[in-house]
């Protein structure tokens, strides 16, 4: 209602963020740059919210080189364009929920819907955990900070949502507008998703030396303890037992399995995985 009042009372002009031919044409210049800088590109992966970005990029690329595959990526919690394409008509979602708030769009536009139908080779979705892992990978490997929406293209490639093996691929990173508190949470989720941190609960006998025994095994296997909580008289524990809740810094999922095996081989009971 606010925008309508500004148009009526102040003479402002409303520019739609994605369902506008001029906006789409502007986005299309990115497609031209991709072909100019990577003329032998095989696959281009683009984030999709309302569809303006991919409409312009796909139009420019397909008109100049129809052999290039253009794929769109949406968040699992906001798949409005995918649902619309699958149903053959524009669909409006009741709600959206994703850390990729820049592409959390309930309903695509009629212009962008038609262009995606014509020019986009396929649309896939990625989960919030996969997005978080992609953000972390970009920070560590490329020294780039992206928002959730900006990282979905990399997430699609990382988690094999698009066939990229043996191909020259361009992942379009569409933005870096991420709050530092959200970034902190995303990094933690990314570490969990990539097997870089792990939480477990171990049931111990309540006697001296048990905690040291666990710590020695973890250290021997190359794990690092981030936090530890020793809990007596916990609900569900034996009267002579206690729970040890540990958060570990690990290398990968194989390393986690190695530590867990060493603990169970030593007689410790892991209660949660």
Regions found by a protein language model. Name each.
Residues 10-14, 96, 195, 240-242:
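Gly-rich Lys/Arg/Thr-decorated short loops/hinges at beta-loop-alpha junctions or inter-strand turns
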Residues 12-13, 42, 121, 143:
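Conserved acidic residues
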Residues 19-119, 158-205, 215:
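Glycine-rich phosphate/pyrophosphate-binding loop at beta-loop-alpha junctions
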